Amino acid sequence: MLKIIIPTIMLLPVTWFSANSMVWINITLHSLTISLMSLSFLNQTDSNSNNFSSTFFSDPLSSPLLTLTMWLLPLTIMASQHHLSKEPWERKKYFLFTLISLQLFLIMTFTATELIMFYILFESTLIPTLIIITRWGNQTERLNAGLYFLFYTLIGSLPLLVALSFIQKHMGTLNLFMMTYWSQELPNSWSSNLMWMACIMAFMIKMPLYGLHLWLPKAHVEAPIAGSMILAAILLKLGGYGMMRITTILNPLTKFMAYPFLMLCLWGMIMTSLICLRQTDLKSLIAYSSVSHMALVIVAILIQTPWSFMGATALMIAHGLTSSMLFCLANSNYERIHNRTMLLARGLQSLLPLMSTWWLLASLTNLALPPSINLIGELFITMATFSWSNMTIILTGLNMLITATYSLHMLAMTQRGKSLYHMHNLNPSLTRENTLMSMHIFPLLLLTLNPNILMGPTY
């Protein structure tokens, strides 16, 4: 584990001590090297972790998320260059320092063995994200978005701390390895039900669960491009990862307590997809699309079958890359037109044909076109929910239909049609942008050849 944690820590002094002209090159190249080193974690053939200590470990569930976290740092740095071009060098370095420290917290969160350490690091990711949103966001509403993000997360997390203290008192340990072999089942009483709720709600808010999702569109829309990418690709997945880790400990209560949440997720999945059809703001549409996809993941985790767990891990990774790419594309439009409204950004296909290709690929992966990983994840989840209750096929099928509709609507609105007069002198697409898009889409295409490395410990 230290082979990626120590080099990431060393990126912090590199940021401050590099010459101004070399900062972007140094940080991008070094972070890309670290992300290539982290690919070795995917080569874990069985569910036993070959790489653990008493502090950090990685297994087939955390490894894909770890690799995704590492892969995204160079991409966020590349995407932010235009956004920071007019800032003084001190602020650019401060921004990179914040990004790298967030990366460090995320790596340690995904690899923590103790639940209390996981909790501390889980909360630590809040601070750099909040700084990125409130300091580098575009509009003044970013302060309101930051407040929403902060209080939703904190209100959900405090009961988790109380529940973890309670478990520590009764079991004497919060080590994940020890707790997996804890044979004592929780009794079906009010106190146990409250403890289950306390453990789960922090992760439900982070995912987010429909009804507790209001912070997400605000945070996404107001955050700079790096903030949006990390929020969509990794911070939402922290909730899914935490739920997967903690629900296995809380059995058999999950079977009794999951029903209202399953209903809410299946209902919210349809509702947020319908909201996407009505959106005019491009970033807001992609944010609501994330809520819809994450509702599927919550359903899969609560059903607690091997197939649903495989579908959840596959969909989390696929959605991380897809939504991050869509935010990059929306940002490339915003940098040229300075507007997020889809009606004012029509006909881009004739002006930026290569960018239009990236739009097509991103939209098709978002609507889960075969043979993408998104489809594999959604099919596994659909089959798992169908075996849980036959009626759910109506809702999951309808969700797939609406997802395809709004994805194609987004593509048609931005790329097709007659371009408006104010768009005729746009800057052409840059090599940096095309590299950025290809580094999002190629992992998605390559993973279709060998999806089993994403399927988690139940594969």
Curated annotation (Swiss-Prot):
Record's bilayer topology term: Multi-pass membrane protein
Predominant localisation class: mitochondrion
TM stretches of this protein: 4-24, 60-80, 94-112, 116-138, 147-167, 196-216, 224-244, 256-276, 284-303, 308-330, 351-371, 375-395, 436-456
Recorded GO MF terms: NADH dehydrogenase (ubiquinone) activity; ubiquinone binding
Superkingdom of this protein's organism: Eukaryota
Subcellular location: Mitochondrion inner membrane
Catalytic activity: a ubiquinone + NADH + 5 H(+)(in) = a ubiquinol + NAD(+) + 4 H(+)(out)
EC number(s) from the headed UniProt entry: 7.1.1.2
GO terms classed as biological process: electron transport coupled proton transport; mitochondrial electron transport, NADH to ubiquinone; mitochondrial respiratory chain complex I assembly
InterPro entries reported in the protein's UniProt record: NADH4_N, NADH_Q_OxRdtase_chainM/4, NADH_UbQ_OxRdtase, ND/Mrp_TM
Keyword terms of this UniProt record: Electron transport, Membrane, Mitochondrion, Mitochondrion inner membrane, NAD, Respiratory chain, Translocase, Transmembrane, Transmembrane helix, Transport, Ubiquinone
Any one of the GO CC terms: mitochondrial inner membrane
Subunit structure: Core subunit of respiratory chain NADH dehydrogenase (Complex I) which is composed of 45 different subunits.
Annotated family: Belongs to the complex I subunit 4 family.
Known function: Core subunit of the mitochondrial membrane respiratory chain NADH dehydrogenase (Complex I) which catalyzes electron transfer from NADH through the respiratory chain, using ubiquinone as an electron acceptor. Essential for the catalytic activity and assembly of complex I.
Name under which the protein is recorded: NADH-ubiquinone oxidoreductase chain 4
Lineage summary: Eukaryota, Metazoa, Chordata, Craniata, Vertebrata
